[in-house]
Amino acid sequence: MSRKLALPVFLLAAVLCAVWSFIEAKQPTPASLREQLIDALDSADAVSYQPDRLDSNHAEGIVTDAKYVEEICALLRRIEPAEGVEWPAGEEQYLFSKASFVLLSGHGSEELTTADGTAETPRCYILNDRGNDRTLLFVHNGSRSYENKDFRLIGALPFTGLDYTIAMDQKLQSRTGSE
């Protein structure tokens, strides 16, 4: 009798282990999200630029200048892990509407402005957290929804995001002015 039970019990245990492994694999960890960010940095070919309206003269939009995209990606590689980093207190507006930069990849130039082209994931959103003199990095989950619950905080950069926005805006101004 015990031999007859051994096979079904073994099979049940194997199925449960497989299901548990699948569930664990689906839960993003800070390490897997950082890996997604690195993949996004490696494949980024454009940046959706939304300058700080008070401190920028440049129109928002898509920037495909390779050197500019490269500079942003190089800086973002300095990300610090998100341990101990929290969503900004009192955040009421959607992160999507407050992001200064969005890394884009896999787009044709005419597709860059589509509002729902989220299939090219992951997308990295960069938010200036001025109250804490830092820049927060988020990865969007790829859904068609852009509520705050659809973003995962993956890390921070330890400098004032506003300063960086202004500096990159000035670089972009000088590039477009020299062309």
Regions found by a protein language model. Give the residues of each.
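Function-determining sites in protein domains
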Residues: S2-E179
